């Protein structure tokens, strides 16, 4: 059984017991979270597709950890003008473990 849901403007395909990295959620580590924006649920041959969301579809998860991703460097450069700017960015994320999928 697997499902597709959206969180943080992105869509994720998950199955029960899987750990997923999402955009930062303001929920403490160890707490439970439910995602109601379920786009699709598949259970063997049976597939439910939402318009836009599956009615009654809920994905339950537990927050495992918070952290920051790898550093991305942004560089602005003008040749022959002695001009160079560098900037770095690290995006916050939340790891969640999927505990249940229900329709």
UniProtKB/Swiss-Prot annotation:
GO molecular function: rRNA binding; structural constituent of ribosome
Keyword Ribosomal protein: yes
Alphabetized NCBIfam families for the sequence: L21 (TIGR00061)
Alphabetized UniProt keyword annotations: Ribonucleoprotein, Ribosomal protein, RNA-binding, rRNA-binding
GO biological process, one term: translation
Free-text function comment from the UniProt entry: This protein binds to 23S rRNA in the presence of protein L20.
Protein's recorded name: Large ribosomal subunit protein bL21
